[in-house]
């Protein structure tokens, strides 16, 4: 789950597939490109970390492969409709 270095090329090499073949197979089976699939997994992992860990926003951003925390915030809000801070705050209030 190292989102910082995961790439279609690396995955194809590990599986013994041609990069283009694997990309087309992923698109056919999921309806999403590898990049879209990876982005969704990153955001799901970030949400999990926000709810179930005490990691800082910067640590979460880095953990899922974003070097720019503000870009992570924008991507997260675009995906979830809420900021990372809002998700964490809701999780904290739910546990009370």
Role assignments for model-derived ranges:
Residues 1-17, 28:
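Membrane-proximal linker segments that couple transmembrane helices to downstream signaling/catalytic modules
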Residues 1-5, 33-34, 84:
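Short helix/strand-capping hinge loops at secondary-structure junctions
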Residues 3-4, 14, 52, 64, ...:
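Helix-turn-helix/winged-helix DNA-binding modules
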Residues 9, 20, 56-59, 69-70, ...:
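Residues within helix-turn-helix
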Residues 21-22, 26, 71-72, 76:
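Short hydrophobic/aromatic patch on the recognition helix
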Residues 28-68, 89-96:
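Terminal helix-turn-helix DNA-binding modules in bacterial transcription factors
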Residues 74-96:
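…primarily DNA-binding HTH/wHTH and HhH modules…
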